[in-house]
């Protein structure tokens, strides 16, 4: 078996590593660097440049020099974050026919995975040059909070680059592997704070060592898939543009060439301010007007930069609290804090993280290389070169289906260890229903419409039967890459439908955070809604069973009783259409009171007919065996 290489496909920089014996080794690219800028350029003469060569020519070719493509991968063009990038990126972001965010390069439409594949090809070539043999397999890292669409798109990029992606691994988890593999750490709980070029993750990970085997178990994860160093750069660029406009009266935003020079200068200044208290942004001949050439010379202090980005740093703190809460831990339970991603070199970030955890982050983990090293370790685990390592990752949000009453019924709860598989039996809502719609949801709210829709499919060909009798088994299966597969099977007919969730749009961080915040803020209203739906379902069941008993009783039921029952049934039916739980319960009680004679007749029939008895008990027991949360009938118009 050949080597499985580990690739950190980053927003700003990428890195490749391999297992060399028992040690992971980060490889230098053709330019002699251990990291490669995730920049791709398409030149006028048709050449494709990747990495440093692409970065060097960006000033003269801004429209066709693509960077931070990871922020677009697996996203919809109409996403708020994408629209924000449309207005600030020098290259052209367009909407594809399927609604995804694509790019227009010299009149050619290109998908983000297609462009990211160029970076992966360079990583592949770097490994092949070092090993002297072809490389066909890789472990690629993604932010822990990447959703299905983004993970799928990353795998697609690997395939386009000629790589079989053996595993998608979360970046903080990879960093934990890099940190914990060669250390005698014993049993420890660590927090991995990963602030990269375009994404932010926090993972709480427990490392256990038993008889020489190390288990890396992710307890909880949280984050923001649209927060990173690029946002810090943008704040500084906007400040410099505004200062220049105040001084010279010229808005550089209308000059792509000037903006590209400014981007490079801002990134350089930001890096310098991590070690210096102030720096000069000096750009001669940045632009010109009728009076002649204009030069930029602006002094920027560390304090100024910190004031520009303070809210971005603070945005990363809230997910830390949620992750700890989900893990059931407090800050005092964390033994070590690991910083990953280039943006964590900023002193303000280090200070805020240290203040939150009450301890200094460790300095013995290289923030640029740890993720690629961890990916290589995982590759070694898959080939068998690395032994006695077990990695247990989690899914970041609950997954379930929409059931009767518009309820989200979870099959897999958030922070469940993956891979995992869970099945549950549901039934039909109406007599002789021949099809159901399986509507797959992701989120934390009780009301189905408050969650993110991942897709839906129909299961047809259900044999005619009374409501509640068919048994439909729904199975959710999340693989080790965090990708969801859903199946629905009619246990009677054996008919089955399956889908892999390949949503072209996925959850962005703000949507996820909003779901979690809404779930917390609306816990009480969610609880009341859930109780209302349960009462409605009980009332609905009572309605159907009473009508059936009236029909079976026939002439044995006195006319007065029948009239009273019909009246109570109509009153309950009206109450079920409302939102008042107490009113439904009252009407159910009234129906029970006027149905006493009916109950007596039913009991007599029960005693007299053994065959009827068996049928009745099966009918009454159905709700014990089947979850009382049912599908709406599939209408033809769907």
Swiss-Prot record:
Segments of this protein annotated with the region Disordered: 604-638
Biased composition (Low complexity): 604-620
Coiled-coil regions listed in the entry: none
Keywords: ATP-binding, Chaperone, Nucleotide-binding, Phosphoprotein, Stress response
GO molecular function terms noted in the UniProt entry: ATP binding; ATP-dependent protein folding chaperone; unfolded protein binding
Glycoprotein found in the keyword field: no
Domain of life: Bacteria
Expression induction or repression: By stress conditions e.g. heat shock.
Family: Belongs to the heat shock protein 70 family.
Protein role: Acts as a chaperone.
Record NCBIfam families: PRK00290.1 (NF001413), PRK05183.1 (NF003520), prok_dnaK (TIGR02350)
Protein name: Chaperone protein DnaK
Species name: Salmonella choleraesuis (strain SC-B67)
């Amino acid at each position: 078996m050949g080597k499985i290489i580990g690739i950190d496909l980053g927003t700003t920089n990428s890195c490749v590593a391999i297992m060399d014996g028992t040690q992971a080794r980060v490889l230098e690219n053709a330019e002699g660097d251990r990291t490669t800028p995730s920049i791709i350029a398409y030149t006028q003469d048709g050449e494709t440049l990747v990495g440093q060569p692409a970065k060097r020519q960006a000033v003269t070719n801004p429209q066709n020099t693509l960077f931070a493509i990871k922020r677009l991968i697996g996203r919809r063009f109409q996403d708020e974050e994408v629209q924000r990038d449309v207005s600030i990126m020098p290259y052209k972001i367009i909407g594809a026919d399927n609604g995804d965010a694509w790019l227009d390069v010299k009149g050619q439409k290109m998908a983000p995975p297609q462009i990211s594949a160029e970076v992966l090809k360079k990583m592949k070539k770097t490994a092949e040059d070092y090993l002297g043999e072809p490389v066909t397999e890789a472990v690629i890292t993604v932010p822990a909070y990447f959703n299905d669409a983004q993970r799928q798109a990353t795998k697609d990029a690997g395939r386009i680059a000629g790589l079989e992606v053996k595993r998608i691994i979360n970046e903080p988890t990879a960093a934990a592997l890099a940190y914990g593999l060669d250390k005698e750490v014993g049993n420890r709980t660590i927090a991995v704070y990963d602030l990269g070029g375009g994404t932010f993750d926090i993972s709480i990970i427990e490392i256990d060592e038993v008889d020489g085997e190390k288990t890396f178990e992710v307890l909880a994860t949280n984050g923001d898939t649209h927060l990173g160093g690029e946002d810090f750069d943008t704040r500084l660029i906007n400040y410099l543009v505004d200062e220049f406009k105040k001084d010279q009266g010229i808005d550089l935003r209308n000059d792509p060439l000037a903006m590209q020079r400014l981007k490079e200068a801002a990134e350089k200044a930001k890096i310098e301010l991590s070690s210096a208290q102030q720096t000069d942004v000096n750009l001669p001949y940045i632009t010109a007007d009728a009076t002649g050439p204009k030069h930029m010379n602006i002094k920027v202090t560390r304090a100024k930069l910190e004031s520009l980005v303070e809210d971005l740093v603070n945005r990363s703190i809230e997910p830390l609290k949620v992750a700890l809460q989900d893990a059931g831990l407090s800050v005092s339970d964390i033994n070590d804090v690991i910083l990953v991603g280039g943006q964590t070199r900023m002193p303000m970030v280090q200070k805020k993280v240290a203040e939150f955890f009450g301890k200094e982050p460790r300095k013995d983990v290289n923030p640029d290389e740890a993720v690629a090293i961890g990916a290589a370790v995982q590759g070694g685990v898959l080939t068998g070169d690395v032994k006695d390592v077990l990695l247990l990752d989690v899914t970041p949000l609950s997954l379930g289906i929409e059931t009767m009453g518009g309820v989200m019924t979870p099959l897999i709860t958030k922070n469940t260890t993956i891979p995992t598989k869970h099945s549950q039996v549901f039934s039909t809502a109406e007599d002789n229903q021949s099809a159901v719609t399986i509507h797959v949801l992701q989120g934390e709210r009780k009301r189905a419409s408050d969650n993110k829709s991942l897709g839906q499919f129909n299961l047809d060909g259900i044999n005619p039967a009374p409501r509640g009798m068919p048994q439909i088994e729904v199975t959710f299966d999340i693989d080790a890459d965090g990708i969801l597969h859903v199946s629905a099977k009619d246990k009677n007919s054996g008919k089955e439908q399956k889908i892999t969730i390949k949503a072209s749009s996925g959850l962005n961080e703000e949507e996820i955070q909003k779901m979690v915040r809404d779930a917390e803020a609306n816990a009480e209203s969610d609880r009341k809604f859930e109780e209302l739906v349960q009462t409605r379902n009980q009332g609905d069941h009572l309605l159907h069973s009473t009508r059936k008993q009236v029909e079976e009783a026939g002439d044995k039921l006195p006319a007065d009783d029948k009239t009273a029952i019909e009246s109570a049934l109509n009153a309950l039916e009206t109450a079920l259409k409302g939102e008042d739980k107490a009113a439904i319960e009252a009407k159910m009680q009234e129906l029970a009171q006027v149905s006493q004679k009916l109950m007596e007749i039913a009991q007599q029939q029960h005693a007299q007919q053994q065959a009827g008895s068996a049928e009745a008990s099966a009918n009454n027991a159905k709700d014990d065996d089947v979850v009382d949360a049912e599908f709406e009938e599939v209408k033809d118009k769907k």
